[in-house]
Amino acid sequence: MICAVYKSLRKAESYLFVEKRNDFERVPEALMAMFGEPKLVMMLPIEKRDHLGFADIKKVRSELKEKGFYLQLPPPVVNLLEQHKKEIGFNPD
């Protein structure tokens, strides 16, 4: 299976994988409105891949088959200062 990967021009580091190039029929309208105009990044032979950057390849394949698309969002931003404060038991009270 070869899928098309699009990036969002509106949402940084957000990618939409679809089964066929320029086929957004199975993608919900609300998602497309939020995603904005999709810009083609690459055509990807997904069956020949063992892994993808931040995405779980098995989940991508599964959602492409079930839903017809997969949305990859950026990982959450980690506040390292707050994380460190919790680790050392800092409490400003």
Curated annotation (Swiss-Prot):
Domain YcgL: from-to ranges: 1-85
InterPro entries named in the record: YcgL-like_sf, YcgL_dom
Domain of life: Bacteria
Matching Pfam families: YcgL (PF05166)
Protein name: YcgL domain-containing protein Spea_2443
